Amino acid sequence: VEDTLRIRRFVEDQKPKTAVLAGGGFIGLEMAENLAEMGVSVTIVQRPKQLLAPLDADMASFVHAEMRRHGVALRLGETVTGFRQDGDSVLTLLEESEPLHSDMVLLAIGVTPDTHLAKDAGLRLGIRGSIAVNERMETSVPDIYAVGDAVEVTHFVTGQKALISLAGPTNKQGRIAADNICGGNSRFHGSQGSSVLKLFGLTAASTGINEKA
């Protein structure tokens, strides 16, 4: 929320005309939509050759068309290597082509669990440094619970441990943990990662796994 307010204040005060956005996931696309509707010319740089990785490529093509139809430029399959100040603008350095000039740059390149506190406390960690919990959302240390983007969960479709950084599962985990802390016996059995995004005039949704998985 603080980042959102800071970005909005910057746009209102500095009135940037151009923006480069690194990352083409849900947050990145929502940010691109909002900036475009505020009159900012947006370019999205994305290392994979499609936006919204959970979608299959043929479905993502509809998202690409909608973004371009609203003036958002796409640089797919390109890698950001760094940034450099150039007077009043910022240069976004690309591995495959010439730098991009813009008035502002935003990073929306995913979520990594920040679990230093859990590690220091001796809690067992899971995939990619996430916090391992049981179905009661209890960690490896009795009476210590964890929920949200930093915990690993079971993916319904694959049966494997996964990181699913979505508000819906987090909300459910929080209620289950609270119930157990208060003496209940609720269980979180996993998630299949259902998500939906409204983007300009298009609605894109996904659930489960895609062809790449």
Regions found by a protein language model. Give the residues of each.
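Phosphate-coordination loops involved in phosphoryl transfer and adenosine-cofactor binding
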Residues: D13-T18, G77
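N-terminal Rossmann-fold NAD(P) dinucleotide-binding loop
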Residues: G28-L29
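A Rossmann-like FAD-binding core segment of flavoenzymes
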Residues: E37-E135
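Active-site-proximal substrate-binding core of FAD-dependent oxidoreductases
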Residues: Q160-S165, P169, D179-E211
